[in-house]
Amino acid sequence: MGDYFKGFAVKVLADVDVNKLSSNQHEFNGSRAFRELLGTPHGKKYLPTRMAYLDDDLEELPELFETFLTWYDARESNAARGPEFRLLYRAEADHIINRAAAGDTLFLAEEENGNLILVIAKKGSTILRQLQWVFDVQHTDDVLFVATDMGMQAPREEIASEELLALLGIDVDLTDDGLLDSILRRFGEKLWPSTPEFSAYARSVVKHADPVRDPDGTLMQWVGMEHRMFRTLEKYRISESIADGFLDAEGVVDVEGFLKLSLSVHNRRKARAGLSLEEHISTILKTNDISFVKKTKTEGKKEPDFLFPSKAAYGDLGFPSQFLTMLGSKTSLKDRWRQVLNEANRIPQKHLLTLQPAISEDQTAEMQAENLRLVIPRALHGAGFTPAQQGWLLGLDDFILEVRAREIAGTHLEQAVLA
C-alpha cells in the first residue's frame, strides 16, 4: 500500500455525518483527527478528490466522481480560540453522500501526489471486509483510525489486492519485463498461447513449489506467476496494437476499433483467470493422486468444475452419495457462488474454491445455510475473516484430505460388494 498512498484514514460514519437534519452542512465530523493525515491547513486547501459509494450490488468498476474537498481552520483568524478544523465536501457530491447511512465506513486515502480518494462502504458488506483487508484495518469499532506510516502496513497478496485497488482507481502494474524474453522464446510468434500451455509454462518457471506438502502455497505461487506473466505478454501485445494506431484508411480515428480492443482485453482477462485457476487446481489434484473428472455433465446441462471420484461413480445410483464430492472454482465470488448450488444434485454439500481474500459474515452465514463450504488458500485465511469464519474455512490441504478419505472409503465399499 505504501507504493500507492502516503497515508489513510478510516471513519465509521455517524448520523451527524450523513443526516442532513442533524449534520453540519456538507461536513465530515471529527475533522480535528484528520489533521494527522492532511496536516495543518494555512488558509483553505482545495484537495482534488475522487469519490464513490461501494456496496455488494456493484457489478463493474465504479466511475469515481471527481470533485474537491475543502480543508481549513474555521478559527484561523481568531488566535484567542483553539483551532476548529473542517473537512467539507461540495454539493455536487451529494448524490454519493446521500446513499450513505450511519454505520457505513469512510476510507480517505492520500495519494503520493497529494490527491485524495474517498470511498464509503456499506455496513456489513463484503466490499467493506475487503477494503479493511487491503488497508490492514481491523479496528472496526473505532470511530476514526488514521495511519501515516505506510511502512507498517502488512503486505498483501498481489493478485488478491489488484481488483480491490482497481475499485479505488489505482492501476497495479504486475508486469515484469524480465520475463518477456523467455515468454517470447517459448511461444514464438503465437499471439495468445492457449491457457493450458501458458499455465504449464508458468508452473515450470516457479521453483521450490511442493504441491503435495504445501498445496495451498503452491496454488498461490502458480496463480501469481501466471498472472504476472500474462500481464507482461498482454502489455507487449497491446503496445503493438497501439503503436499501429487507430486510424482508418482515410486517416479518421477508428473509435470502434479502439472499443473492440478494450473489450477484447476485458473479456480475455476474465476468461483466462478462471480457466488458469482450474488448470492449476487440476495439476495439484493429479500430483496428489486424487481421482476426479473435469467439466462433466451430471444432470441435463449441469456441469461442475470438478467431480470426485468419477462420472461413473456419480452415475451409479448404488454408489453412496456420501462418498461423492464436487468442487467449483471462482477467482472471486460476488453473488456467483449461488451458481454451484444447482450442480450435481446427488451431492448435498457443495465445495467452492476461491481466491477472494475477505467475505462478510452475512454472506458466509448464507453459504452455511445453503450447505456450501468454501475452500480458500491458507495465505488468505487471515485478516479478511473473523475467527469464527476462519474456523469454518477449509484450506486446499484440508479439502484434499477430505476427498482422499471419501475416495478410500468408496473403494473399500466397492471391494466389499465384489467380495
Describe the role of every protein-language-model region.
Residues H139-K190:
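Glycine- and charge-enriched low-complexity intrinsically disordered segments
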Residues A93, N267-L275, M326-K330:
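Short, charged/polar micro-motifs that form catalytic or ligand-binding hotspots
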Residues M1-K122:
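Long, contiguous, compositionally biased segments that the model treats as domain-scale units
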Residues S182-L275, H280:
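Interdomain/boundary linker segments immediately adjacent to catalytic/signaling cores
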Residues E279-S282, K286-T287, F292-A419:
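Catalytic core segments in nucleotide and nucleic-acid processing enzymes
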Residues N113-Q130, T232-S241, G245-F246:
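Accessory beta->alpha helical hairpin/"wing" motif in late/C-terminal subdomains of nucleic-acid enzymes
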Residues F65-R81, A100-T105, A109-L116, K123, ...:
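Charged, structured surface patches that assemble and position nucleic-acid processing machinery
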Residues A9-S23, D254-K302:
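Acidic-basic catalytic patches of nuclease active cores, encompassing PD-(D/E)XK
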